[in-house]
From Swiss-Prot:
Pfam families, sorted: LRR_6 (PF13516)
Other notes: Several proteins derive from AAC-rich mRNA, which, due to a frameshift also have ACA and CAA codons and thus are Asn-, Thr- or Gln-rich.
Chain spans, region Disordered: 1-20, 51-103, 125-148, 307-333
Name of the protein this chain belongs to: Leucine-rich repeat-containing protein AAC1
Length: 797
């Protein structure tokens, strides 16, 4: 008592404007009751109070209140700063910030950090508690400590202050990921700029956040970090929309069982459980249940768990009670050899029963429950989370425990197999996910047995599913035939992704009448029968706008001819991808060009990495003639990865005299010749004539792959694309016409054509510029004045 009172008197006599008290985090074996009993004989530095998310203000005027730990407040309330009183009359307002580490020393659980600091200060002759306070800025430190900054003010200042301070600082483990993200995206030049504008960054700039859990060692400090993080999410950072928890090691968990079960998993659970603002959650590479390799196989064979000998592993949880054995009614699928139960009570192959009831008392409150019953979430993304048979049952039981009116996107990429598809189909058929629009089930090893359940899901009229992704599974033509009836009944599905499956040799192809986007990338559609069935489907479809047939080896003349006939009939397609199909002038290119001349709806086509040479380029040049451009001008033509030379390029750009603005965008990979090539291009530009009436403006943009994605994503205050605004400025500066009704500023007259010629045979930009013809003006019959149609052409090299 004397020692503590002397310290208080010294602190009052000095009347410093601010002091800093450093305390250590608690361990899980600390007893709060014993600490209160021995508080009279314990100094401030030796006390290790448990941290909580919110501390209640302590209004007790007892002289020993400064040595007592704050009361615990477990409920989420307001984010007011905590206040405490001492024997002096000066109130103290405390604000708590937390910093975590990138690398920490190997400390034991019972290590007292205060004793270590006091010894270091004694060696350096520094005071242990009194330091100057400066402006708090997030910095990358190398120790895991919790710093409490106390600011002393007068009683009059406290009475005049009515608003509480707000904590604008995230823990360092979160700050580090934001800094790396912002520097990588180019929003800031270096990490110092991010720290300087940290408040602005947290409040307005950050929308997506990835957390990798690197170098986590102390369980108590990480628990406190998660509490501070949850408080910050719900009180300050309203612009944050997505949080991702990612295992950087992919198929291995480089943490012991103790740390994963007591540090990482509780961190994720706290964020999901108390979430009030975040709409999108992603978990990639982490199991969503406790792991214990000795008692159960909860990790996939691809996972590798590294055990730590320095930390005792947690005792294995008691084994779950055996599930009730219920005799199942059977409905035999057409191609399945096992009994399948589809009723109000679903029994899986392991004998577990999935009931649809609203009683949540029997469901364990873990990450499964918090994910599926958090009605703030609109998107759940689970990839490679190591679900075994028991985990599948627990997850889908939690998902079926109540009706969800907020979840719009569900992504499960974790090899859930046919058993998981059976459990999910019961939930979808009963329409427990009322507003689900997007369902992605790629890489789940689905077979034709899953196609049977998918057919029932597609046949459900109450389910308003718009996007279905079944890529990278094992469904073949027989499974697609089983789903044919569901496609015919479904009226809401707009996008179907069936890439990397086994469509095989079948002419029975029908994806329904409501499909607008169809992706059959790398699905073995190159056979004569499958192309015949697909062509027949395209002829009678009146809704499809996008078709992806890349990597299907459709290089035969008969296959291209059959597909071209469907293009000539269909008048709704806008984008077609025929990349990597060995198409050339000898194998169907003439038929393809003829059909595109008849079809006036297709404005974008990709012929990347085929066998197109100069002869084929001459055939493709027919797409830019006057009649085709009059009805529906092309906007995009991808010819990259082919063998087009100067002769073919000259034929392709022969009709560029219609355009007044030409962008030649190329990618120069030779760093040593950058200056040389740039000087050559500038000299060629100077040699071009720029007259008032017949001119052709040329703009060179180097390194297309580095600049174009940024230009296309950033808009100005007027809502226009920066590239379009730049074009309009060049056009306006080159015109001498003072007529206010001129069509120069009309955006409808500014169209865009992109021709991608990258990765072809060497094409020198200086020669390409010389091939561009001049602009030819046209006269109108009404006023006999020249009218310019300002259009944009982009040649990509």
């Amino acid at each position: 008592m004397k020692r503590t009172s002397n310290r208080n008197e010294e602190a009052t006599a000095k009347l410093s404007s601010s002091t800093t008290i450093t305390t250590t985090t608690t361990n899980k074996y600390y007893n709060m009751a014993n600490a209160e009993k021995s508080s009279k004989s314990t100094t401030i530095s030796n006390l290790i109070p448990k941290y909580s998310l919110f501390n209640e203000p302590n209004n007790d005027n007892d002289t020993n209140s400064s040595t007592r730990p704050n009361k615990q407040q477990k409920l989420l309330k307001s984010n007011e700063s905590t206040t405490s009183t001492t024997t002096t009359t000066t109130p103290i307002t405390t604000t708590t910030t937390t910093t975590t580490t990138t690398t920490t020393p190997n400390l034991s659980k019972y290590y007292n950090y205060n004793l270590y600091i006091e010894k270091q200060n004694e060696k350096q002759n520094l005071p242990t508690t009194e330091t100057e306070t400066t402006t708090i800025t997030p910095t990358l430190t190398t120790t895991t400590t919790t710093t409490t900054t106390t600011t002393t003010t007068t009683t009059k200042q406290i009475q005049n202050t009515t608003t509480s301070t707000i904590n604008h600082f995230l823990p360092l483990i979160i700050q580090k990921e934001i800094i790396f993200l912002l520097v990588e995206l180019g929003s800031f030049l270096n990490a110092r700029k991010v720290c300087k504008y940290w408040k602005k960054v947290c409040n307005g700039c950050v929308e997506n956040l990835n957390i990798y859990f690197t170098d986590i060692h102390l369980s108590a400090s990480v628990k406190h970090v998660s509490e501070v993080f949850v408080k910050s999410l719900n009180s300050d950072y309203f612009h944050l929309q997505s949080v991702s928890f990612i295992n950087g090691a992919k198929n291995s968990i480089s943490y012991s069982e103790f740390y994963f079960n007591n540090v990482i998993l509780p961190f994720i659970e706290n964020v999901v459980r108390y979430n009030q603002t975040i709409e999108n959650f992603t978990i990639k590479g982490f199991p969503i249940t406790r792991i214990n390799n000795k008692s159960s196989q909860q990790l996939l064979p691809s996972y590798k768990l590294y055990h730590s000998t320095s930390v005792p592993s947690s005792p294995p949880p008691p084994p779950p009670p055996p599930p009730p054995q219920i005799q199942q009614p059977t409905i035999t699928a057409p191609t399945s050899t096992t009994a399948i139960a589809v009723s109000s009570t679903t029994t899986t192959a392991t004998g577990q029963t999935l009931n649809n009831n609203n009683n949540n008392n029997n469901i364990p409150k873990g990450l499964n429950y918090y994910l599926t019953n958090n009605f703030k979430l609109k998107k759940i993304n689970l990839k490679n989370i190591g679900l075994d048979s028991r985990d599948k049952f627990d997850f889908f039981s939690s998902l079926s425990s109540s009706v969800n009116n907020t979840l719009e996107t569900l992504i499960i990429c974790d090899n859930i197999g046919d058993e998981g598809m059976q459990l999910l189909s019961v939930i979808l058929i009963k329409n427990l996910l009322k507003v689900l629009k997007r369902l992605e089930l790629q890489k789940n090893q689905f077979t034709n047995q899953s196609a049977y359940y998918l057919n029932k899901v597609l046949s459900c009229e109450q389910l308003q599913l718009e996007t279905l992704n079944l890529s990278s599974n094992r469904i073949d033509e027989q499974g697609l035939i089983m789903m044919k009836d569901g496609f015919g009944r479904n009226k809401s599905l707009k996008e179907f992704i069936f890439s990397k499956n086994r469509l095989g040799n079948t002419d029975s192809v029908d994806f329904g009448k409501s499909i607008t986007s169809l992706d059959l990338h790398d699905s073995m559609v190159g056979s004569k029968q499958s192309i015949k069935g697909l062509s027949q489907y395209l002829k009678f479809n009146e809704s499809i706008t996008s078709l992806n047939l890349s990597f299907n080896h459709i290089g035969s003349n008969e296959a291209i001819k059959s597909l071209s006939k469907s293009f000539a009939v269909n008048q709704t397609l806008k984008f077609v991808d025929l990349s990597f199909n060995k198409i050339n002038s000898n194998f169907g290119l003439d038929h393809l060009v003829s059909s595109l001349l008849i079809n006036h709806s297709i404005h974008s086509i990709s012929l990347q990495s085929n066998q197109i040479d100069n002869t084929s380029a001459i055939t493709l040049s027919q797409l830019f003639n006057s009649s085709r451009q009059l009805f529906s001008p092309f906007k995009y033509l991808n010819l990259s990865g082919n063998k087009i030379g100067i002769g073919g390029l000259k034929k392709l750009i022969n009709d560029l005299s219609k355009y007044s603005k030409t962008h030649i965008i190329y990618n120069n990979n030779d760093d040593n010749n950058n200056n040389k090539n740039e000087n050559e291009n500038k000299s060629k530009i100077k040699n071009l004539s720029f007259n008032n009436n017949n001119n052709n403006f040329v703009k060179i943009i180097k390194n297309y792959h580095d600049t174009i994605p940024i230009i296309r994503t950033i808009n100005n205050s007027n809502g226009k694309n920066l590239l379009e605004e730049e074009v309009e400025q060049v056009i306006n500066s080159s015109s001498n016409d003072t007529n206010q009704n001129d069509n120069i500023n009309n955006e409808n007259n500014l169209t865009e054509i992109s021709i991608d010629l990258s990765s072809n045979s060497p094409l020198e930009v200086s020669k390409v510029i010389g091939l561009i013809p001049r602009y030819k003006s046209k006269l109108t019959f009404a006023d006999r004045k020249p009218v310019k149609k300002y259009k944009l052409v982009k040649l990509l090299f």
